[in-house]
Design a protein with these regions (language model features):
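Short, basic, glycine/proline-bearing loop/turn elements
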Residues: 30-35, 108-115
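Metallocofactor- and cofactor-centric catalytic cores in central/energy metabolism, strongly enriched
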Residues: 118
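Two-metal-ion RNase H-like nuclease active-site motif
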Residues: 57-67
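Acidic, metal-ligating active-site segments
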Residues: 66-107
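Long, contiguous domain-sized segments
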Residues: 1-52, 57, 121-378
């Protein structure tokens, strides 16, 4: 006979039953990671990065955000991008300037999610284009999100607004790299380095293919400059079963310590049809994770390039600057330009709420309609 129980009672019983098993499983994973993490360092799959004692560089960061509000059976949205231009002079930070772009419109529910993500990507590249047209472009340009798009963003229907926005985003990316090729790394070894940073907020947008450093297949996609020591790698692979059940995020967090990065890996090998395809086929896409402190979560960096483009020294120098520019704030750690840009983007929700109130008032009073009709009557 089933005895009716409340949800509170059910949760209390389940928590008591599952707590010991879950805690034991997590503790075992932590112990396994602690045992194997030093071997990843010895093999060269995890590298310690020298944090620059004196940071002297010009660094720009582009952050994007969108928000929606219900109106008349549909949605209004506002999508915005903010770029912060910073200068580090002997670790002293100064703001050189800022730029922004925004769009406000209505949107259908079915089109909402991916279409707005594509608008974010396009706006980020528009801000990057403005930065490269400045008299003195930044040394490093960070984009909060992906540098290229993968198949998860391809629209299903060809006639939808999503499809049109997808084509606009792809063309904007292609035009940026083509127009500024002479100013950008890897075409110009002394040019601006453009890097995509996959933060927690944009994990779904980035949808970036990662190489699993625990598997032989993932290890085969490492850049030549970061190839590990074969003999130690063999020992790690023989212990692979003990860490194979650990999630990718927990695994990366467990092997990375303070001021460290993973070996760089090719990101376009297991994900064909990254777009723009011609750009990806020509240059390739590489990535690595870095971690600035034990309190910070690892961040994934995406770069254009291949074996011929990057050296270990160049990757270490870039990681060192990113580590020095990453600051812990309100429970998360991202580069300083993103934090400053997000302070401006926090106002989007309040702005859209006020905009909706005004729109409802206009619709209720029919003032817009009356103004159109008055023109016809005259």
């Amino acid at each position: 006979m089933n005895i009716p129980t409340s949800l509170v009672q059910t949760l209390a019983v389940q928590s008591q039953l599952n707590l010991p098993g879950t805690a034991g499983r997590l503790l075992k994973q932590i112990r396994d990671l602690e045992n194997v993490a030093p071997r990843f360092v010895e093999a060269g799959l995890v590298l310690t990065v020298d944090r620059p004692a004196s940071l002297d560089t010009r660094l720009s960061g582009i952050s994007t955000r969108f928000t929606t509000a219900k109106l008349a059976g549909g949605f209004l949205f506002v999508c915005a991008a903010v770029r912060m231009d910073l200068r580090f002079d002997r670790n002293a930070l100064a703001t050189e300037g800022t730029d922004s772009a925004s769009v406000i419109d209505d949107i259908d529910f079915l089109d909402q999610s991916k279409r707005l993500q594509l608008i974010e990507v396009r706006q980020a590249y528009e801000m990057a284009d403005h930065a490269m047209k400045m008299e003195a472009p930044p040394r490093i340009l960070l984009i909060e999100g992906p540098l290229v798009l993968n198949r998860s963003m391809v629209p299903l229907g060809k006639a939808s607004q999503h499809a049109k926005e997808y084509e606009r985003a792809v063309e904007t990316i292609r035009a940026f790299w083509k127009q500024h090729e002479s100013k950008l790394f890897p075409w110009n070894p002394a040019g601006t380095v453009v890097a995509g940073i996959a933060t927690e907020r944009l994990g779904a947008i980035a949808a970036i293919s990662q190489q699993d450093l625990r598997t032989i297949e993932g290890q085969q996609q490492l850049l030549k400059c970061d190839l590990p020591k074969a003999e130690i790698l063999g020992d790690i692979n023989r212990q692979r079963s003990s860490i194979s059940g650990i999630g990718e995020k927990r695994f990366v967090r467990g092997i990375l310590g303070t001021n460290s990065r993973t070996a760089a890996f090719k990101m376009d090998v297991q994900t064909p049809r990254m777009e723009p395809a011609d750009l990806v086929d020509d240059q390739g896409v590489v990535g690595f994770h870095y971690r600035s402190s034990v309190l910070a979560e690892p961040l994934l960096v995406q770069l254009l390039g291949n074996d011929a483009s990057w050296t270990r020294q160049q990757l270490n120098e870039l990681a060192g600057v990113l580590i020095a520019a990453t600051v812990q704030r309100e429970g998360y750690a991202v580069p300083v330009p993103f934090q400053l840009a997000q302070q401006q983007l926090h106002s989007l929700k309040n702005f859209l709420d006020q905009y909706c109130l005004t729109m409802r008032r206009e619709l209720k009073n029919r003032e817009v309609e009356d103004s159109w009709l008055s023109d016809l009557e005259s």
